[in-house]
């Protein structure tokens, strides 16, 4: 019991120390010296007592084990990093031979030391792993060489409906380019800015029956010739020759569907009043302009209400493609009278193949660019025209026929003059015009006004 007390007093010393490695051998040596001195001093007096109660053989292996532990601990002290086996042996020896207070203090110090070592090892491992992961990221998730406009166009063109919402564009980019999935800062704002600023992208409002949020984004039809450059990754337009080929293909496509450039151009290339329609249900002809074949519809002439007649009907009304009739013109339902031709325009346009079919409608094939030169005039029904008299239909048709050879004497066919002699005019118009058209078609090649 005294032996345990002595050891307890000796083991209280390591509380003020900083390192357990330097104190463990000293503690073991002090234990050995105290054990030897205590045994030598008490053995002569209590030899039999120790012999019966504390036999020497159990103490000798204990001292031998302590010496072995001391040797094992001295060897690791020569190496810079402490071995884990030495720490565990020291911990076991301290717990076995020390008192509760000393053992608790030593155990706390060992735990702190082990925690620091584990933390350092963990940090070193993390640094190594993060370095490897960084290399993998740099090798695998490089920034794609495409501009934001190219990414947007790529996403919209590859969508099934050729339209996407803003979130749909984000999802496409993150799905196909892991770099943007890992780095989400900044590029989404850039996508929004490019959508708003680039004219290639058009915002389409969502239909009220379509569930969801956000508008759709589509590509402008004019961006068909825009492609993504292979080296730069930016949007580029095709060359002039490629555009010409693409325009030719578009023209053929539009001709097959009936959509033409002149349909959209409207009255910009045709001098008509805005309330008259440019579309004709029988538009099937083409115009060769400057040697280039371009689709061109057969436009109804607004003066057709005066020049054409429904030969099958007896109501003396002039059926036209745009729904105008002489009855409406005479009664003053339309504020503006229709266009009328001067002599030069009449001579230039009428022999171009005006046909009066049995149905009463007509199909006019414009063949001269002079028709686009604005050789028509406007007049109001209330303006008197003293040059015209309501004599008879034969005189009017004769005057129209004579005007084809004398462009300097223009004659007009005003709507106001048709009011008194409408029945006689409509009765004799078909016969006079048919003779006139036949004569003009035969001599159209010698007419100097046709170009």
Curated annotation (Swiss-Prot):
InterPro entries: Fork_head_dom, FOXG1, TF_fork_head_CS_1, TF_fork_head_CS_2, WH-like_DNA-bd_sf, WH_DNA-bd_sf. GO terms for cellular component: nucleus. Residues 108-143 have a biased composition (Basic and acidic residues). GO terms for biological process: axon midline choice point recognition; dorsal/ventral pattern formation; inner ear morphogenesis; negative regulation of neuron differentiation; negative regulation of transcription by RNA polymerase II; neuroblast proliferation; neuron fate determination; positive regulation of cell cycle. Its main location: nucleus. Residues 29-80, 101-143, 389-417 are annotated as: Disordered. It comes from the Eukaryota. The keyword DNA-binding applies. Residues 35-55 have a biased composition (Basic residues). Keywords: Developmental protein, DNA-binding, Nucleus, Proto-oncogene, Transcription, Transcription regulation. Residues 142-233 bind DNA. Residues 389-412 have a biased composition (Low complexity). SUPFAM superfamilies: Winged helix' DNA-binding domain. GO terms for molecular function: DNA-binding transcription factor activity; sequence-specific double-stranded DNA binding. It is found in: Nucleus. Retina and brain. The keyword Transcription applies. Pfam families: Forkhead (PF00250). May determine the nasotemporal axis of the retina, and consequently specify the topographical projection of the retinal ganglion-cell axons to the tectum by controlling expression of their target genes. This is Forkhead box protein G1. It comes from Gallus gallus. The lineage of its organism: Eukaryota, Metazoa, Chordata, Craniata, Vertebrata.
């Amino acid at each position: 019991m005294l032996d345990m007390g002595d050891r307890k007093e000796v083991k209280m010393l390591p509380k003020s120390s900083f390192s357990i490695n330097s104190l463990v051998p000293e503690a073991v040596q002090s234990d050995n010296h105290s054990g030897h001195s205590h045994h030598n001093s008490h053995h002569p007096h209590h030899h039999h007592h120790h012999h019966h109660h504390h036999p020497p053989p159990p103490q000798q292996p204990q001292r031998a084990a302590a010496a072995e532990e001391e040797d094992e601990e001295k060897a690791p002290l020569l190496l810079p990093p402490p071995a884990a086996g030495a720490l565990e042996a020291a911990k076991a020896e301290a717990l076995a031979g020390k008192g509760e207070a000393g053992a608790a203090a030593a155990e706390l110090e060992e735990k702190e030391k082990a925690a620091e070592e584990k933390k350092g090892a963990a940090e070193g491992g993390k640094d190594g792993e993060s370095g490897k992961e960084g290399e993998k990221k740099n090798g695998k998730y490089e920034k794609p060489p495409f501009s934001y406009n190219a990414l947007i166009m790529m996403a919209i063109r590859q969508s099934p409906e050729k339209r996407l919402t803003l979130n749909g564009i984000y999802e496409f980019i993150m799905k196909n380019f892991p770099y943007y999935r890992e780095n989400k800062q900044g590029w989404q704002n850039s996508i929004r800015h490019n959508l708003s600023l680039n004219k290639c992208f058009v915002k389409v409002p969502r239909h009220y029956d379509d569930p969801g949020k956000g508008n759709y984004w589509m590509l402008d039809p004019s961006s068909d010739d825009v492609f993504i450059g292979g080296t730069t990754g930016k949007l580029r337009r095709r060359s002039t020759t490629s555009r010409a080929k693409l325009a030719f293909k578009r023209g053929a496509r539009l001709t097959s569907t009936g959509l033409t450039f002149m349909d959209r151009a409207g009255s910009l290339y045709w001098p008509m009043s805005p309330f008259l329609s440019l579309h004709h249900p029988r538009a099937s002809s083409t115009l060769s302009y400057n040697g280039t074949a371009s689709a061109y519809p057969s436009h109804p002439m607004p003066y057709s209400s005066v020049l054409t007649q429904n030969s099958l009907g007896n109501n003396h009304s002039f059926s036209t493609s745009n729904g105008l009739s002489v009855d409406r013109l005479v009664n003053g339902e339309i504020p503006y009278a229709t266009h009328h031709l001067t002599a030069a325009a009449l001579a230039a346009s009428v022999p171009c193949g005006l046909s009066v079919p049995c149905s009463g409608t007509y199909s006019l094939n414009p063949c001269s660019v002079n028709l686009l030169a604005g050789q028509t005039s406007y007049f109001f029904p209330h303006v008197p025209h003293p040059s015209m008299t309501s004599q008879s239909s034969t005189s009017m048709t004769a005057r129209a026929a004579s005007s084809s050879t004398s462009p300097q004497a223009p004659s007009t066919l005003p709507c106001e003059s048709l009011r008194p002699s409408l029945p006689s005019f409509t009765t004799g118009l078909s016969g006079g015009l048919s003779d006139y058209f036949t004569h003009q078609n035969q001599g159209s090649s010698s007419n100097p006004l046709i170009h």
